[in-house]
Amino acid sequence: MRNDLVLEDTTLRDGEQTPGVAFSKETKTAILNALIEAGVTSIEIGIPAMGGEELDFIKSVVDRQDEARLVVWHRGVREDVERSLDLGFTSVHVGLPTSAGHLKASVRKDRTWLLATARDMVKMAKDRGAFVSISAEDIARTEISFLQEYAGVVAEAGADRLRLSDTVGLLGPEAYGERVAAVLSAADIDVQCHAHNDFGLATANTLAGLKAGARYFHVTVNAIGERAGMADLAQVVVALKKLYDRDLGIDLTKLKKVSRLVAEAAGHQVLPWQPITGDNVFAHESGIHANGMFRDTSSFEPFPPEHVGGERRYVLGKHSGRALVAWALEQEGITPREELLPHCLEEVRALSIRIGGAVSHEQLVEIYNKAAA
């Protein structure tokens, strides 16, 4: 895995393509600010060809390109890219399909058109001094030999990077890594991973692509995006930091704050068990786990919650043990009598089953006081 990896967040483009999600100009600005504050240095901001408020937002941030690389996304239409360059943007992306099926269904063109269009658009944008990124979309259903040919054409034209998009998440990690390696062996160009989560493998595929030599990778906050979403910013960044010793300069303590901002904007809740940013990631209920945590907090946590802006919680419930009941009472200023703990534990478990959830400290105190009376 390289040491010069570059994260690019696409919450404002692919993330907003989540069915039912629409960000206002003000919301997109707030998300952009939060990403930059967290240390994200490359951000795909939207699609100028949509016009309206989308274009208003894009125009409003053209003077902020010194804060992060701001990438604008385009169809395979030369005039679209030219308009973005005329606005003053210096980083452009062109989305083009490479599979025969997508070429026929999406743009009604063939591969002769594709190669000519890709070459022309890259050369035009490079002649104007832009950083040029271009897609190979639907790589799972594109022959590896054609991916290599396409990579050679866009590299020769001067493209700065090739985005390998597993558009409907059909690849496993081994197959995704194989395609990255095949492209890198055939062309002198940086590769960007763009993995969708239809089989729950977007994070694994992104890491596999990076291990195969890709430099860039796409993520979204909370993994939002088309259908099942894509690779999650927090998951990939923390995995790189904790498992692969790659520090991308992201302020991990801001991950949960950014996650909640985007969740509210998208009208979605963050699942309690969402890795890294979910509320249950550092929550403990079962007796064995809580007992171990009281002795050594590394027993049942991969890293301290404060590393990612989280908090440790202990939850009273059906699976709790006496140690957790005693601890909870002590938190309420009560030194529990040892002989009352078995009864209190039995009552906590029974109440948890009746209400179908966690027992509050107030309910525990009531149970204890009745037993002690």
Curated annotation (Swiss-Prot):
Cited Pfam families: HCS_D2, HMGL-like
Gene Ontology biological process: antibiotic biosynthetic process; carboxylic acid metabolic process
Reactions this protein catalyses: 3-phosphonopyruvate + acetyl-CoA + H2O = (R)-2-(phosphonomethyl)malate + CoA + H(+)
Pathway: Antibiotic biosynthesis
PANTHER family named among the record's database cross-references: HOMOCITRATE SYNTHASE, ISOPROPYLMALATE_HOMOCITRATE_CITRAMALATE SYNTHASE FAMILY PROTEIN
Organism: Streptomyces rubellomurinus (strain ATCC 31215)
PROSITE patterns: AIPM_HOMOCIT_SYNTH_1 (PS00815), AIPM_HOMOCIT_SYNTH_2 (PS00816), PYR_CT (PS50991)
Gene3D superfamilies: 1.10.238.260, Aldolase class I
Keyword Transferase: yes
Protein name, as recorded: 2-phosphonomethylmalate synthase
Record family assignment: Belongs to the alpha-IPM synthase/homocitrate synthase family.
Function: Acyltransferase involved in the biosynthesis of the phosphonate antibiotic FR-900098, a potent antimalarial agent that acts as an inhibitor of 1-deoxy-D-xylulose 5-phosphate reductoisomerase (DXR), the first enzyme in the nonmevalonate pathway for isoprenoid biosynthesis. Catalyzes the condensation between acetyl-CoA and phosphonopyruvate to yield (R)-2-(phosphonomethyl)malate.
Keyword Transferase listed: yes
EC number assigned by the record: 2.3.3.19
Domain Pyruvate carboxyltransferase: residue ranges: 5-256
Family matches, as InterPro entries: AIPM/Hcit_synth_CS, Aldolase_TIM, LeuA/HCS_post-cat, NifV/FrbC, PYR_CT
Organism lineage: Bacteria, Bacillati, Actinomycetota, Actinomycetes, Kitasatosporales
UniProt keyword list: Antibiotic biosynthesis, Transferase
